[in-house]
Amino acid sequence: MKPINIQDQFLNQIRKDNTFVTVFLLNGFQLRGQVKGFDNFTVLLETEGKQQLIYKHAISTFAPQKNVNLELE
């Protein structure tokens, strides 16, 4: 049985759905936008046509504007 990677499923679903998300950083700063891509270490966030590459180790929380449907089975 293949292990479930919730992080990748979550990020991929909000990317595919173009869901707006608030990203809370460890320093308390908040970024709002859409996830355009991600890898093991970074997340590419687009806000008002501008891109920001955020390192995952700096992220505390993702708060999407709507619920994300995941296939956890």
Curated annotation (Swiss-Prot):
SUPFAM superfamilies: Sm-like ribonucleoproteins. Residues 8-68 form the Sm domain. The keyword Hydrolase does not apply. GO terms for molecular function: RNA binding. GO terms for biological process: regulation of DNA-templated transcription; regulation of RNA stability; regulation of translation, ncRNA-mediated. Keywords: RNA-binding, Stress response. GO terms for cellular component: cytosol. Pfam families: Hfq. Belongs to the Hfq family. HAMAP family: Hfq (MF_00436). Homohexamer. NCBIfam families: Hfq, PRK00395.1. RNA chaperone that binds small regulatory RNA (sRNAs) and mRNAs to facilitate mRNA translational regulation in response to envelope stress, environmental stress and changes in metabolite concentrations. Also binds with high specificity to tRNAs. This is RNA-binding protein Hfq. It comes from Bacillus pumilus (strain SAFR-032).
